Amino acid sequence: MKRKALALLVAATLWTSPGVVGQTPNSAAPRHITLHEAVELALKHNHDVRLAGFSVDEKQHAKEAEKSSYFPSIHNDSNLARLTDTQLIQINAGSLGTVNGAPFPAESSILNQGGRTLTASGTQITQPLTSLLKIRRANDIAEAEVKASRSKAQLTTNDVALAVHEVYYAVLIAQAHHSATEARIQAAQDIESERVQQVKFGASLEQESIESRANSLQAQQELLTTDLQLTDLQLKLNDLTGLPLNTALDLDPSVGEVQESCPREECVVTAKNSHPEIQAARAEVEKAVAAVRLAKTDIWVPDVDAFGRYSYQNNVPFLARNFGTFGIHLSYDLFDAGHKHAVLHERESQLSEAKENLAKVSDEVELQVQTAYNKLERTQQMLKVSEEILALRHESNRVQQQELLRGAALKSQAATASAQEFEAKALLLQSQLDYARAHDEFVRAMGATPE
């Protein structure tokens, strides 16, 4: 079943309707927009889509930050200090022996150990060794978070696109109902006029005249309700697409084609393999697995780093002004009151939770696909029924118009038949768009973006 082939019927149904959403007599020219353009605008300007994109960027930068831990780090440590006092060293005369029979030193001396103002500066390069194992696990966690954020962003994109489709269809349906209601009002007014004349000549009861008046007012009330609904839908569509809320829109009734769906079981398998929600859940499992490995590594593997340092000092005793230092640094917690093991148990619980959530999401996706598939089949059947109803209403209206020309039918009867045909057209349009909407929901359930 193709939507494009139904565009003429949509246009014919809407020709007497408002057509332009949100337009007032003094408003600017409406903006013509197609369904595809509305979806593109929403994906470009919608706040939820933009927020999801920023979340992906955030996780990507977090991954880059974790990756940088693989490489050596260089940092400088400098100090300027003022001492209140220093230790003095006294060397007595002759304490160092004699030189050519004379005591050395010849007299006692008092030496100061350095100055009271100290300057020290060191630049050190550090390369993690055993910590690389922990860094790898941290990078696995960051990579899983990136995957999850991308899947969630895709899910947000699918939801926003589906919402645009639903509101777009709702506007077209409301416009069709607007036309049908106007036709009903005209028919009710004709009946009311005839009843008034019949009451004057005694051919009808006054109660029938009152009833026809009530029907006319009820139709006008429905028209006002439809107008209010159109206004609300226009605001919602503008909000979804990122347009100013007061933008008047002229919606293109041609909404593309419905593609043939895959067999039911094949659809379920495809959805489980590619649905963004399942992919996000799988990424959470990968993240939890990496977190468990990191916790185990943190328990058993000490932190070993290789470092090299170049230092400069002034007034620090017993050190050269410039010197280098090279070595290995090892750090290991001998006792932490069970903290690391508790963290490991926490990560294992999170892993179990992530696996259970994956199973839950998989079941939910299968349910969504089955439900959407059933709805697609039902709406297709409803579409066929609506087509038959329209054919009968069209034939009835044709007969009534011919009888009106021959004088065998009243004007109100012909107007009622026309109104019923308009209602049948609106019903068919609603069935068509319900079928299209069901297909879009099916596409979303499969994990794809409705176009």
Where in this protein do the model-derived segments appear?
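Acidic, low-complexity, intrinsically disordered peripheral segments
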Residues: 2-8, 20-27, 82-84, 88, ...
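N-terminal signal peptide c-region/cleavage motif recognized by signal peptidases
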Residues: 16-17
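Regulatory alphaC helix of protein kinase catalytic domains
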Residues: 25-39
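A small-residue-enriched
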Residues: 40-130, 162, 243, 268-342, ...
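Sec/SRP-type N-terminal targeting helices
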Residues: 50-54, 67-68, 112-117, 129-157, ...
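Periplasmic alpha-helical coiled-coil/stalk elements that build and connect Gram-negative outer-membrane
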Residues: 157-270, 372-375, 379-382, 399, ...
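A short glycine-centered flexible hinge/capping loop motif at secondary-structure junctions
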Residues: 199-203, 404-408, 445
